[in-house]
Structures are given as structure tokens and as C-alpha cells.
Swiss-Prot record:
Domain of life: Viruses
Pfam families xrefs: PolyG_pol
Keyword tags: RNA-binding
Biological role: Protein that binds to ssRNA and may be involved in genome packaging.
Biological source species: Aquareovirus G (isolate American grass carp/USA/PB01-155/-) (AQRV-G)
Quaternary structure, from the entry: Homomultimer.
Family of this protein: Belongs to the aquareoviridae NS2 protein family.
Gene: S9
Keyword RNA-binding (UniProt): yes
Name of the protein in question: Non-structural protein 2
InterPro entries named among the record's database cross-references: Reovirus_polyG_pol (IPR002507)
Signal peptide boundaries: none
UniProt-recorded Gene Ontology molecular function terms: RNA-directed RNA polymerase activity; single-stranded RNA binding
Length: 350
């Protein structure tokens, strides 16, 4: 046995730990990673993992590739042993009981799911379901697009578009005004995106990460909307719309939950990490866009300040803004200066 001195033992000791905040709000979950290796110093890194996990549904094959492994079994989800909300959503389960993160199923939403997956729409959204978590529905739709039955994981035919974007690593989510044919902010609210007409106004541009001298034989950006009609794109707009609705629902519920708000009082830097990630979804909803502009004008000091503006948008008067394409992102300009950029969200990759 090799001799272990004190230095070896110290180096071998795990000096990092992680914890999750807002686990009961699937799109708002924030992961805190703390490293205590520094003397008298705890370094904390915050990341908005809830939104990151939600965005990965836009690349179904990469997101669910582990489910194709032989012998893979999903964790059991029963009333006696309920799964944590995060784990349940990632596996396409829906809660057996009502909770505040759910929305009511409307005829427009059923029609949208039927248009996205004509053959398996009844499995994705059963007729008996009247309330559902938007992210659970997005996961089930994404699983079907990846070629997996959302109930038993039996392999089916994947959507051709999911094959096209499988090796991409990021996506820029855009909204357009169909009447004027230009980039715009969805002014009708996120709920409008859960209809066929609303989801059709969402465009997605997929891209590849190129680091250093690594060259990939692929274009810098891929827009499924420019592909032939045999590549369906409505499901991409539906998934993006469900993410936006989940964000609005969770922010509304967090504003009324004082207990969860108290858990954030010791983590003021978490707000900045959350807002940076939220900017990728800013064009999907006028409420989300207003929140991002307000943060750009005067950064929120903590989550309580963010929720005050969310609940009372009139507290912050925002200037007239314009959108401009700047390289791989969308620049939001106001008062003659750049307020923030709508950047591409990472979506994993094969």
C-alpha cells in the first residue's frame, strides 16, 4: 500500500458540493455549486438548470438517447413512491395529483398536439387529462418526436426534423409577426403559443459549437423553417410555447409562495444567472420580455425585486425598443443603447 501523506489526503478530499433551489418549480430550478478548497473562501457558482433542461427538449434525439440503451428502465412512478417533480418531468411522467404548476387543457392545445403528432396524440395527451404540467407535455411530445412511445418507450418512427437537428448544440428561439413578416415579441401572451396559429409564429435556428481549430463539416446555422415541407416544424414551436407557459406559471406561483422565497434570501447572485438564461426565451412572451428589459435598465438585487416587477409590471416604465440581428444573436436596443442580447440556448448534442 502506497504511503499517503497529509497533502495527498487533502487533495483527495472532495471539496465541492451542490444543492438545488426551487425544485418544486420545474422551469425555475437553480443549481448552486460550492467549492470549499480555497482557504477561508467558499466559491459559489449558480446556473439556471431548470431552463437548461427544458430547452433540451428542442433536440429530442440527443435528450433521450439514454432511453434507447438496451435494458433501460424508467424509475417507477406510483402513488406510494412518487418521484421528485424534476425527475418525473424528465421521464415524461405527469403528477397523479393536482398541483400549482399545471395548466388547464384547452381545445386549442389538443388541436395543437394532434397537428404535431397525428398518430400518437392520444398517448401524448389522453382525453381524460384535464390539467397537465406544460413541461411534462413538452417532454412527452419530444419523446415521440425522438421515436419513442411516451408510455412504454417502444421505438417508433422519429420525426425527420429531429434527425436533422440531432447533432446541433444550441438553438436561437425567435418570434415573428406574420402580418408584417418581421421579428417581433409575442405580444399576445404565452398562452397564445399553445394554439396552431400561435406555435406557427415561432422560428428556431439551430447552430453548432466550433472551438479552436476543431472543424465540423456542417453549416454554422440550420433553420428547419427553410427546409422542404416534409420536415415538420410545428412541434418545435409547440415545445417552445410550453416552456414559456411553464415559466410564466412558475413565476406566478413563486410570487405567492413566501416559504420558497425565503430560501433565496441567502443567494442574491442567483438572480443574475437566472435572468441571463431567461433572455434566451424573452421573445416568447411580452411579460418575459418586459422583465428582461427591466433587469437591463436596473438589475434586480434579489429575487424579491424580480417578483415585484413580475407582479406589477407598471413599476418599471420601459422605453421603446427595437430588435436587430447581430451575428448569432438578437440585439435588443432602447434609448440608443444595447439593453441585452437574446442568445442561443445550449441544447446538448449527440
Amino acid at each position: 500500500m502506497a504511503h499517503l501523506n497529509a497533502a495527498t489526503l487533502i487533495n483527495a478530499e472532495r471539496s465541492d458540493c451542490s444543492l438545488r433551489l426551487l425544485e418544486n418549480f420545474p422551469s425555475l430550478t437553480i443549481t448552486v455549486r460550492q467549492d470549499t478548497s480555497g482557504r477561508d473562501l467558499v466559491a459559489s457558482t449558480y446556473s439556471a438548470t431548470g431552463m437548461s433542461a427544458a430547452a433540451r427538449n428542442l433536440n429530442p434525439l440527443a435528450n433521450f438517447r439514454h432511453m434507447r440503451q438496451p435494458g433501460y428502465l424508467r424509475p417507477p412512478h406510483t402513488a406510494l413512491k412518487p418521484l421528485p417533480l424534476r425527475t418525473a418531468i424528465m421521464n415524461g411522467y405527469e403528477s397523479l395529483t393536482r398541483h400549482n404548476g399545471q395548466i388547464q387543457v384547452t381545445p386549442g392545445l389538443r388541436e395543437l398536439i394532434k397537428e404535431c403528432a397525428p398518430e400518437l396524440h392520444e398517448s401524448i395527451l389522453p382525453a381524460t387529462v384535464q390539467h397537465i404540467t406544460p413541461l411534462s407535455l413538452a417532454t412527452r411530445l419530444s419523446m415521440v418526436c425522438a421515436g419513442l412511445h411516451c408510455d412504454d418507450l417502444v421505438e417508433t418512427r422519429p420525426v425527420t426534423t429531429s434527425l436533422t437537428v440531432a447533432f446541433t448544440t444550441k438553438v436561437l428561439i425567435l418570434a415573428v409577426d406574420p402580418d408584417e413578416a418581421k421579428l417581433a415579441v409575442n405580444a399576445r401572451g404565452a398562452d397564445h403559443l399553445l394554439t396552431v396559429d400561435g406555435a406557427s409564429t415561432i422560428l428556431t435556428n439551430f447552430g453548432y459549437d466550433i472551438r479552436g481549430n476543431v472543424r465540423r463539416d456542417a453549416p454554422q446555422a440550420l433553420s428547419p423553417s427553410d427546409l422542404p415541407d416534409c420536415y415538420p416544424v410545428l412541434w418545435l414551436g409547440a415545445v417552445a410555447g410550453l416552456i414559456a407557459v411553464q415559466l410564466e406559471t412558475d413565476l406566478d406561483q413563486l410570487g405567492m409562495n413566501l416559504t420558497e422565497q425565503k430560501t433565496l434570501t441567502a443567494h442574491p447572485p442567483a438572480v443574475d444567472a437566472f435572468m441571463r438564461k431567461l433572455q434566451s426565451f424573452a421573445l416568447l412572451s411580452s411579460r418575459l420580455f418586459h422583465l428582461c428589459v427591466a433587469h437591463a435598465l436596473e438589475p434586480f438585487r434579489d429575487m424579491a425585486a424580480l417578483l415585484r416587477v413580475w407582479q406589477a409590471p407598471t413599476l418599471v416604465q420601459i422605453p421603446e425598443v427595437s430588435l436587430a440581428i447581430k451575428g448569432p444573436s438578437i440585439e435588443v436596443q432602447g434609448n440608443g443603447t444595447q439593453l441585452f442580447q437574446v442568445r442561443a440556448a445550449p441544447i446538448g448534442g449527440m
